[in-house]
Amino acid sequence: MNKINRVAIIGGTHGNEFTGAFLVKKFQQFPEVIQKPSFETLTILGNPKAFEAGKRYIEKDLNRCFLTESLQNPNLSSYEDIRAKQIAGVLGEENQPKVDVVIDLHSTTANMGLSIILGNQDPFLLKLCAYLSEINPLVKVCYTIPEKGSNFLRSLNKLGFVIEVGAVAQGVLNAELFQKTEQLIYTILDYVEKYNQGNIPKINNLLSLYKFTGTIDYPRNGNGDIQAMIHPDIQFRDYAPLNPGDPLFLTLDGKAIAYEGTSIVYPIFINEAAYYEKGIAMLFTEKQLINFD
């Protein structure tokens, strides 16, 4: 692979996710902390208006506005659609990138710890993630289906990925998570510098990967009203195995609803506040161990 010349760090794609937004503000105030000899690092505050308002978005979810057809559609004129086009103008798109790596910073009310979310299995990303998880076992790596035609910001670039940290409330800064995320970013930038110098650290060629398999909504009645909540046994237990028959939800009158799947899954984004409007109680993943050279 060619040398990496430009890395982009985006925070505040969702305006009420303060960890990434304030890290970008710090990096803009102290740019020397993210600069390396062999490549340039640029920063973008994703959704400035939503950040000022302390809201996830103004009119629509910015992180669902990056479909190629949407970016090329002059009739889409919401604030987030316009902002997506501005960001794509800086970063380029996958077939015409203007940067080499895109790091999109997010936070979650779910207990995701330090998570990396990939949209493809590019060898560079797999080796980076193997390195990160080897030096810090708390780092978990998730993989969604290949995102050709995706509407996520990270899909603008083949080497785009998300850092997702939690649990932290919306519109709140948590110093511990802020510092852990900051250190993770510095480690990534150090890795890129070593990569450019042809001095990639030796790592175990095994990586635990949590592959997205589906979602589940809260139980609802005929009017669409939620009738059950996350069962206490799995609340804040993201990445823990969920076996068939294990309690999944608790109805408003105190009855347990079991997981009816036929195989073990590993739930993530459990009880994410922003997903209530999307009809998602949690995401299901399967745990894989991949071997690469």
Swiss-Prot record:
GO molecular function: aspartoacylase activity; hydrolase activity, acting on ester bonds; zinc ion binding
Residues engaged in binding Zn(2+): H14, E17, H106
Keywords, comma-separated and alphabetical: Hydrolase, Metal-binding, Zinc
Chain residues that bind substrate: R56, N63, R64, E164, Y275
Cofactors that this protein relies on: Zn(2+)
Cofactor note text: Binds 1 zinc ion per subunit.
Organism: Trichormus variabilis (strain ATCC 29413 / PCC 7937) (Anabaena variabilis)
Enzyme class label: hydrolase
InterPro entries, per database record: AspA/AstE_fam (IPR050178), Aspartoacylase (IPR016708), AstE_AspA_cat (IPR055438), Aste_AspA_hybrid_dom (IPR007036)
Coiled-coil stretches: none
Protein name, UniProt field: Probable aspartoacylase
Pfam families named in the record: AstE_AspA_cat, AstE_AspA_hybrid
Entry's family note: Belongs to the AspA/AstE family. Aspartoacylase subfamily.
EC number: 3.5.1.15
Substrates-to-products reaction catalysed: an N-acyl-L-aspartate + H2O = a carboxylate + L-aspartate
Annotated Gene Ontology cellular component terms: cytosol
Cystine bridges: none
